[in-house]
Amino acid sequence: MSNMEHDRWSRVKGRLRSSVGEDVYSSWFARMDLEAVQPESVHLSVPTRFLKSWIQTHYSDKVLTCWQAELPEVCRIDLTVRSPMRAAVAKEAAAPVEHRRAEHRPATETRSHATVPASSNHDALGGSPLDPRLTFASFVVGRSNTLAHAAAKQVAEGRRGDPVMFNPLYIHSGVGLGKTHLLQAVTWAGNTGIERKVLYLTAEKFMYGFVAALKTQTSLAFKEALRGIDVLVIDDLQFLQGKTTQAEFCHTLNALIDAGRQVVVAADRPPSDLESLDERVRSRLAGGLVVEMAPLGEDLRLGILKSRVVAARAHHASFDVPAPVLEYLARAITHNGRDLEGAINRLLAHSKLNAQPVTLEMAEHEVRDLIRPQEPKRIKIEDIQRIVARQYNVSRSDLLSSRRTANVVRPRQVAMYLAKTLTLRSLPEIGRRFGGRDHTTVLHAVRKIEGLVSKDTTLSDEVDSLKRQLQE
């Protein structure tokens, strides 16, 4: 991808993010790649058929509109499902980074790996494919993921009949920070013997399995099979759609937890932010251990880079990346683990195809499009409510209540104003998060505070202080 194409694609993604909101963008578009731009069409790709179908059904017009703002002559968007594994050395050195599902995968081979079942149990129960490289041994531990790693290890090392310490275990983070790696590691480790049945499913696989069971009138067998699992591992829960499917997931979740079976779940946001999920599901998920995997620190990024180089040497013994180059990459590439792996893949490809050693100059040229500006902190409505409540000495439940006393109304209006100005939530969404209020109530609050801060210096200082606290 040339610099011009990269810049154009970045602008289109920015328009799309502004159009649909941050949460929708993260759920449905974060893994969409630009493949090619033709005179009248644009070729995009996504990793799964489910994503392709959902985007085509619900967002095709928005995607086309965003592209037409950049290239008016574009009249068609071609969306395809890309191969889950792209061989690095089969492409030119400047090819874009792989966007594979599994986080922190080592760049061990330049050919595709066949996915294999963890055990006959996992295979017979129709589990989602597992990558044999995603184990605890290949997971790089750092400050941002220590708790998630420790909790996952404890789950994996448990035995049938042991008391369950935290249930469910809910891991959330942004894209490419290691959630899938940990979940598949739990599955691999748990299925090393025959004592326990550990099943890994993506939310997409769960949906398709349940819908297929309904169509073939085998839903009872589907339910019984799931409820006989010792450890159920569900990935990408944010994609779970449909009231009937969500109800069945809730019943399965309750049945397993009540029976003392372990449930492990991963998603791209905390349970409270999964607005498309039924409140009962969110409540049950929040009742377990909720662990956030924070963005990768520089030391952890360096550790991941080193591990990928070691893995690559297993098949390319002469491949080497000097320490100054690794340190440069760790400082410059800050977004996620996939970009780090993509950088090593590019250096490996360039070095092998051109028979040249890796240098700092080569690295600066090859990864320039992976160096992104630092993203601002993502502020959540729950954070706004918590900090505003603390500032004005009221409770969060007061902000959500119908109370109309002066000591509650003003903080509530300030919180709504901050939610509108510091997040990408729509007015109706903000209203729902403030006790189910109408969007006109939110609009009134926003306009009220906008008018007051220009005249009331005390209120203006309070709002500025709240913004600083939220952005720290």
From Swiss-Prot:
Keyword Phosphoprotein: no
Residues annotated to bind ATP: G176, G178, K179, T180
Annotated region (Domain IV, binds dsDNA), positions in chain: 352-472
Region annotated Domain III, AAA+ region, chain positions: 129-351
Pfam families to which the protein is assigned, alphabetical: Bac_DnaA, Bac_DnaA_C, DnaA_N
Signal peptide range: none
Keyword field: ATP-binding, Cytoplasm, DNA replication, DNA-binding, Lipid-binding, Nucleotide-binding
Region Disordered: start-end pairs: 92-127
Chain residue ranges for the region called Domain II: 73-128
Compartments in which it is found: Cytoplasm
Record region (Domain I, interacts with DnaA modulators): 1-73
Gene Ontology molecular function, alphabetical: ATP binding; ATP hydrolysis activity; DNA replication origin binding; lipid binding
Any one cellular-component term (Gene Ontology): cytoplasm
SUPFAM superfamilies: P-loop containing nucleoside triphosphate hydrolases, TrpR-like
GO terms (BP aspect): DNA replication initiation; regulation of DNA replication
Biased composition (Basic and acidic residues): 97-112
Family classification: Belongs to the DnaA family.
Function: Plays an essential role in the initiation and regulation of chromosomal replication. ATP-DnaA binds to the origin of replication (oriC) to initiate formation of the DNA replication initiation complex once per cell cycle. Binds the DnaA box (a 9 base pair repeat at the origin) and separates the double-stranded (ds)DNA. Forms a right-handed helical filament on oriC DNA; dsDNA binds to the exterior of the filament while single-stranded (ss)DNA is stabiized in the filament's interior.
Subunit structure comment from the entry: Oligomerizes as a right-handed, spiral filament on DNA at oriC.
Domain notes: Domain I is involved in oligomerization and binding regulators, domain II is flexibile and of varying length in different bacteria, domain III forms the AAA+ region, while domain IV binds dsDNA.
Protein name (record): Chromosomal replication initiator protein DnaA
Source species of the chain: Rhodopseudomonas palustris (strain HaA2)
